[in-house]
Each structure stands twice: as structure tokens, then as C-alpha cells.
Regions:
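Charged, amphipathic alpha-helical segments and their flanking helix caps
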Residues: 1-24, 44-142
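A short, hydrophobic beta-strand-centered structural micro-motif
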Residues: 34-42
């Protein structure tokens, strides 16, 4: 599921910002091209629910490395506003998932945009064996 969400985030970023912004999800090389995004999943968790249902919580950090060093804050604020809009709903397997607890931080001249995606999953439990045959004797009373 993490990879599906990561792909959906990448698609939403590409739709919003276009092809001139590189999107990375693996280690960034030293000579990476700016402007770019780096996406990482932080501390996924799972909570038990009724039956075979589980709530998985995925926190993503979308880091933005700006191109313009002169108007740095202006560019970072502008990108952050766009991220609030494009990360609210992402499309996974023709379903929409809503981003929650969105917030942004500017640290070391780059933007960290945090968003949670919570998803219910169903796990198949052990299957019970079925009886092969059953014989029923029925008598009617009068």
C-alpha cells in the first residue's frame, strides 16, 4: 500500500507542477536537478479493528527543494499552498483517499510538507474447514 500511495502522490505532484519538477522517492544523488520533490513515508502504523479490519496510518514527508534562491520564502510559500490543494485527495486504484493533518515547515531552506493517509485494510484469516456430508433424520409429529 505504501508504494501505491507513493505513486499516487507522485501523480498528483506531476499534475499540479508539471514535468519540469523532478520527483524522487529513493536516495537523492548529489547532483540532483532543482526544483524537485523528495517523498518519504515516515513511521507507518497499524491499529486493530473489529474482525479482520485494520486501520493503517501512513505519514508522508514531501520535501521540496526550490530553484530560486533569491525569493526563497516566496517560492516555498507558493508551493506549500499548492500542496494543500493537490494533496487533499489522491487517486489510488480509482478510489479517492483524503489527506489529513497537513502541515508545512521550512527547515534549512527547503519545505517539508507532512500529510497523513489513513486506510482500512482487510486481512484474510484462517479458513474453517467445511463438513463433507451431513445426514439429517427428520420426523414429523401429528
Amino acid at each position: 500500500m505504501i508504494n501505491k500511495i507513493l505513486d499516487a502522490i507522485s501523480n498528483a505532484l506531476n499534475e499540479e507542477f508539471g514535468d519540469e519538477y523532478e520527483i524522487y522517492s529513493e536516495d537523492i544523488k548529489q547532483d540532483f536537478k532543482e526544483p524537485c520533490f523528495f517523498i518519504i513515508c515516515l513511521n507507518p502504523s497499524e491499529q486493530d479493528f473489529l474482525g479482520n479490519r485494520y486501520l493503517r496510518k501512513y505519514l508522508f514527508d514531501i520535501q521540496y527543494f526550490p530553484k530560486n534562491k533569491k525569493n526563497l520564502n516566496s517560492e516555498l510559500y507558493s508551493v506549500q499552498e499548492k500542496l494543500f490543494n493537490c494533496m487533499e485527495y489522491i487517486n489510488i486504484d480509482e478510489d479517492l483517499i483524503r489527506g489529513l493533518k497537513m502541515r508545512g515547515e521550512i527547515v534549512d531552506k527547503k519545505l517539508h510538507f507532512f500529510v497523513n493517509y489513513n486506510v482500512f485494510v482487510f486481512k484474510k484469516g484462517p479458513q474453517d474447514e467445511f463438513m463433507e456430508n451431513i445426514k439429517i433424520n427428520m420426523k414429523t409429529r401429528r
